[in-house]
């Protein structure tokens, strides 16, 4: 089997050298590397130093446009995706091909392990949070319609597809700008009967967000992306939990805001109810991290705060995109 590794890049000069160095250690005759770049910095110059890489320059049209350009250029039977802020281990491709063979899978993915392990609480949280930004798989998982919403899906920085999938017209949806793009593609494949497998032997090292602000912005954007997924895939079991959560959240906020002007007593009651729910959620998460996960006490105290804050911003991102979509449709009708 021939393998094509596709990397879509934009302004990655800070990270790209580490990725290219790791790819240089795994390149063989049957492996090609395609970098589709839309950068305004020195990223393309750095990539050009690596003779094994095919560099394609593209105007800034979005991540998924770049991915699809890479797919159309790929010659491999297997097309593998990773990102510029990753580092791949030497056995990465070998393990991917092994899972394809053992499971007769159409898609293989895996973990995104913290490159900065132990650097800070923020970087550790991405793997250790209750619904981790970047998943770690402890066992092999085969996804179906039922498990699609129960287990974290493999991330787009560590996904491999049989070329035949793209030959049949399944591509990344280029409307997505803020996340959930790989979820959309995986859902369409799962719905149509293709076999998707995640395996712990298939992993990359990912440079997780290192600051709280970066993490919170990421969660807000993921919420925006999920609204696009919800709008396009209401038949998916993954579409509705965040949507329902967002609308209930909005209802409580609207009730709190309205009661502030209309009834001080109602404002107090609603505020106390929301505060009580928040405290109960915090304590539940604290004991989960302390008893089940056996994390250090500092993490047990702080991770629930991050969980609540990140999920709130995710819901805000969903609502923000929803409101923008409604305003856009109203504007179109009035023109």
Each PLM stretch: what is its role?
Residues 21-30:
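Short, acidic, metal-binding catalytic loop of nucleotide-sugar glycosyltransferases
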Residues 22, 36-45, 86:
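A conserved acidic beta->alpha catalytic loop
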Residues 58-74, 156:
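Glycine-rich, basic loop-to-helix element that forms the pyrophosphate-binding segment
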Residues 79:
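Short aromatic/hydrophobic "clamp" motif used to bind/position activated sugar donors
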Residues 91-124:
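Conserved donor NDP-sugar-binding/catalytic core segment of glycosyltransferases
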Residues 110-111, 128-151:
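Short, flexible, basic/aromatic active-site loop/helix in glycosyltransferases
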Residues 116, 173-178, 182-234:
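Catalytic donor/gating beta->alpha subdomain of glycosyltransferases that bind UDP-sugars
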Residues 140-161, 177-178, 204, 234-237:
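A recurrent flexible, glycine/aromatic-enriched loop bordering the glycosyltransferase active site
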């Amino acid at each position: 089997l021939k393998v094509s590794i596709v990397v879509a890049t934009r302004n990655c000069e800070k990270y790209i050298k580490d990725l290219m160095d790791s790819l240089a250690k795994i390149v063989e005759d049957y492996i090609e590397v395609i970098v589709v770049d839309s950068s305004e910095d020195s990223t393309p110059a750095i990539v050009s130093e690596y003779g094994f890489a095919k560099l394609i320059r593209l105007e800034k049209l979005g991540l998924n446009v770049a991915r699809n350009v890479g797919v159309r250029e790929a010659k491999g039977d297997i097309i593998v995706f990773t990102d510029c802020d990753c580092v791949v281990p030497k056995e990465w491709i070998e393990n991917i091909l092994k899972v394809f063979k053992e499971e007769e899978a159409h898609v293989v993915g895996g973990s995104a392990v913290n490159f900065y392990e132990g650097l800070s609480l923020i970087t550790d949280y991405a793997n250790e949070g209750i619904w981790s930004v970047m998943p770690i798989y402890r066992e092999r998982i085969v996804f179906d319609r039922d498990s699609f919403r129960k287990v974290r899906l493999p991330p787009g920085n560590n996904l491999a597809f049989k070329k035949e999938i793209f030959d049949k017209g399944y591509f990344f949806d280029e409307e997505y700008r803020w996340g959930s793009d790989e979820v959309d593609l995986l859902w369409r494949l799962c719905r149509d009967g293709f076999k998707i497998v995640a395996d712990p032997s298939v992993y990359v090292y990912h440079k997780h967000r290192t600051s709280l602000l970066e993490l919170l912005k990421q969660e807000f954007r993921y919420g925006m992306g999920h609204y696009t997924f919800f709008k396009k895939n209401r038949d998916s079991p993954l579409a509705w939990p965040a949507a329902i959560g967002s609308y209930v959240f909005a209802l409580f906020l609207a009730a709190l805001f309205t009661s502030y002007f209309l009834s001080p007593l109602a404002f107090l009651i609603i505020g106390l109810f929301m505060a009580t729910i928040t405290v109960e959620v915090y304590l539940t998460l604290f004991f989960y991290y302390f008893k089940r996960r056996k994390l250090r006490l500092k993490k047990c105290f702080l991770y629930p705060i991050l969980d609540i804050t990140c999920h709130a911003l995710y819901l805000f991102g969903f609502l923000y995109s929803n409101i923008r979509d409604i305003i856009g449709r109203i504007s179109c009708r009035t023109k």
